[in-house]
């Protein structure tokens, strides 16, 4: 067996290398694992991009070397995320190694080099004694979201309708089924009512992150998500690239907000990325806004999204 590897933590030109898989590694090898290669007599780290049985004819087998070491048994970029990586590189004209940087924390390679990449078993306790009561309209909408066959839903709501209660009910449902959920909110509202309300209901052990969180803490949360310890994640657009093991719903609040479009290399649109994740997996996508974007409304009109409304204002 052979594999393609792409550079991790280094800037190379647009290429990948072909290496042979030693027979001792064949049973344990997976796409997305980090491997060690001595390149030009230097220790470098790469990610397995593709595995194949037969070597391409244009490559001389005698020139192919073997991987030195698999540095971590866990695959941080599973098969469908490799497809997502390819999509980003092609759709946004981004070199593959630049796109890869979206999927792995900056200091991960340093932990790999030092042999300090160890998962800590962290127990997350989510539920409080508080109950989440829905109005008749909210309960009806919740059931419709769950039963809807179209995985992609656009929720058009009015101010005062308390759509956060719908979010909580959805997160609670998937948590009880031991599944992972992701709620994306704009950077500017990370400390707003949504985050506070969710903290009050699920306690403070759910993951809530923003750009002020340190790289070390991001890596810690990265490992918690990969190991399935963390079930509920609230974050900005970059959370889409984290290694969820069993992600069943992505909720994007204020989907019209410009902060979902990255202006840094590699540039990307988080709404498009979330759509692609839904296409590549079983994940349901819920886009919510009181002023939906033109693109989202167009998709709803053309049945790419199921359009649902929440126009009833909540009364205490």
Question: Which positions does each model-derived feature cover?
Answer:
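Accessory, non-ATPase domains that flank or precede helicase/AAA+ motor cores in DNA-metabolism machines
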Residues: 1-291, 296-297, 301-315
């Amino acid at each position: 067996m052979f594999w393609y590897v792409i550079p991790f933590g280094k800037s190379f030109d647009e290429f990948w290398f072909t290496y042979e898989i030693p027979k001792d590694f064949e049973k344990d090898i997976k796409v997305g694992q980090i491997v060690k290669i001595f390149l030009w007599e230097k220790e470098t780290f790469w990610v397995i991009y593709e595995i194949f049985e037969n070597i391409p004819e244009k490559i001389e087998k005698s020139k192919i070397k073997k991987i030195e070491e698999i540095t971590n048994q866990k695959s941080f970029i599973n098969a469908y995320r490799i497809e997502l990586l390819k999509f980003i590189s092609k759709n946004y004209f981004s070199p593959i190694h630049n796109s890869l940087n979206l999927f792995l924390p900056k200091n991960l390679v340093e932990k790999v080099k030092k042999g300090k990449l160890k998962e800590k078993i962290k127990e997350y306790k989510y539920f409080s004694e508080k109950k989440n009561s829905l109005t008749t309209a909210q309960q009806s909408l919740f059931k419709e979201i769950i039963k809807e066959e179209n995985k992609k839903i656009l929720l058009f709501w009015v101010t005062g309708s308390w759509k956060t209660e719908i979010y909580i009910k959805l997160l609670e449902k998937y948590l009880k089924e031991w599944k992972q959920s992701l709620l994306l909110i704009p950077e500017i509202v990370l400390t707003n009512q949504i985050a506070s309300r969710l903290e009050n209901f699920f306690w403070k052990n759910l993951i809530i992150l923003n750009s002020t969180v340190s790289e070390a803490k991001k890596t810690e949360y990265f490992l918690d998500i990969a190991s399935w310890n963390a079930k509920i994640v609230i974050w900005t657009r970059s959370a889409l690239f984290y290694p969820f093991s069993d992600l069943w719903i992505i909720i994007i609040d204020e989907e019209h907000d410009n902060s979902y479009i990255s202006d840094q290399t590699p540039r990307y649109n988080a709404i498009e990325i979330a759509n692609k994740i839904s296409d590549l997996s079983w994940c349901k996508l819920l886009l919510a806004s009181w002023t939906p974007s033109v693109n989202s409304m167009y998709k709803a009109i053309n049945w790419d999204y199921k359009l649902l409304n929440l126009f009833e204002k909540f009364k205490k």
